Amino acid sequence: MKTVLVTGIGGLTPRSITGIIRENHPDYHIIGVDANKKAIGFFMKGLLDEYFVCPRCTDPDYFPWIERLVDEKHIDYAFVQPESEIIEWGDYYEKNGKFPVPVFMGCKALSVSLRDKSIMAELLEGTEFIPKTIKVTQDNPRYEDVEKEIGFPCWIRATEGTGGLGSLKIEDISSYKSWLFINSFIPEFTVSEFLSGRHLANEMLYYNGEYVKGASLECAEYVMANIAPSHVTGNTAFGRFLNEDRINDFCDRCIKFLEKKLGVPAHGILSFDLKEDKDGNMKVTEVNIRHMAYAGVMAHVGFDLIEDTIKIMEDGNADRVERAPFFHYAKPYIFLRDVDVAPIILEGESVFK
């Protein structure tokens, strides 16, 4: 029996991860923490054995609190999910030479570079991996560059955050100015060429620079899409699991480029969001430094990076993790998701005909 800590338990992804741990290891003692006292994961029957409200990760009391919890509850390892916490844990490691408890995550340099979309865009500028992209701010909106360098239609989104924060297809300069005004609370954005093709996603596991395992899917429709001006809410309502090796290959080449650029090995879970252009060429729109929201539903169709992460943290190596850089699903599975219901997996789209 192990005692496992899951941070950010109010979020969809940490709850999904916890559900898989509970299914795979019913005897494990799971502790959830969140800075929000109303975190829904606290109150989901059967999900957790214990829960605690913790300080925010930027609070000076955060790590002393975590250290006490680890010591008092004899925690064996942790799933740290919110990206803000991952950055802080990386900083803790750099200062102390160790984590408060074993985790599986990459170094701070890679995490910081991928979390901020503008830094990622600068690192990948001029490559095949991203669309034409510039960074703009409320103080320097670069109207002329947006119009002449990027052109319309274009795509705008916040440099940090998930769930499509601050994103919209912009048709003209007037709409661009209006969007900045409406989102005056967001200090920085990236503006890029508009991509009209499929929205793809890929989750990958790296261990000390080795690409160990990866699988992909298509985000075809979004939950409550009509409530967001961009129609992208961050949660997929209908998705297709894909056996397209070119997606995995493209993402791995992108990571290898970043490894060389930053001088650090990829390590941990990296999750890509991609869009295809009108010709089907893939472009990276985001790389998350954690498990993605689909981790649980992917586990149910045979691609279980949650269990692989447990193996790595328990063994201290990746020897027991299957090498499957081009993982193929057994069937053309699809999934349906919505609010307040568990995802539904179907064996194909023939049921819709």
Locate the predicted segments by residue.
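ATP-binding N-terminal substructure of ATP-dependent carboxylate-amine bond-forming enzymes
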Residues: 1-105
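Short glycine-enriched loops at secondary-structure junctions
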Residues: 34-38, 83-85, 210-211, 217-221, ...
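Short amphipathic alpha-helix with an adjacent loop that forms part of the alpha/beta core around
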Residues: 62-72, 143-149, 180-182
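ATP-dependent carboxylate activation and anion-phosphoryl transfer catalytic cores
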Residues: 73, 245-353
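A conserved helix-loop-beta module that forms one wall/lid of the active-site cleft
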Residues: 96-166
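Conserved ATP-binding module of the ATP-grasp superfamily
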Residues: 130-131, 153-155, 165-198, 256-262
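Short beta-strand-to-turn element immediately C-terminal to the catalytic PLP-Schiff-base lysine
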Residues: 136, 167-172, 205-207
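ATP-dependent carboxylate/phosphate-activation module, predominantly the ATP-grasp catalytic core
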Residues: 193-199, 203-259, 288-313
